[in-house]
């Protein structure tokens, strides 16, 4: 598991990233937002980003959802 930090509304919050190689999925959790998602590890960069945007857009403004999804996508693909 990788723990990253995200700047959100003048706060630093923890983001937990886990890749299960055996079952081919990513688990991403941001407890301070009461949010988590499971993504198929077979998705490409664009698909990961789009899925994250859709998930985040349900409770974040569009610009915030885009910013957070972009950062999460970078972390997922670099780890």
Where are these regions (language model features)?
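A short, structured beta-strand/loop element
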Residues: 20-45
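A general, composition-driven signal for non-globular sequence regions
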Residues: 1-3, 13, 36-39, 45, ...
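Negatively charged, low-complexity tracts enriched in Asp/Glu with abundant Ser/Thr
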Residues: 1-16, 50-59
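Mixed-charge, Lys/Arg-enriched low-complexity segments
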Residues: 43-79
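Alpha-helical structural elements
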Residues: 11-13, 21, 30, 70
């Amino acid at each position: 598991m990788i723990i990253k930090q995200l700047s959100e509304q003048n706060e630093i919050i923890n983001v937990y990233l886990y890749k299960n190689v055996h079952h081919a999925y990513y688990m991403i959790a941001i407890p301070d937002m009461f949010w988590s998602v499971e993504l198929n590890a077979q998705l490409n960069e664009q698909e990961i980003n789009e899925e994250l945007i859709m998930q985040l857009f349900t409770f974040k403004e569009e610009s915030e959802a885009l910013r957070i999804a972009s950062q999460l996508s970078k972390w997922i693909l670099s780890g």
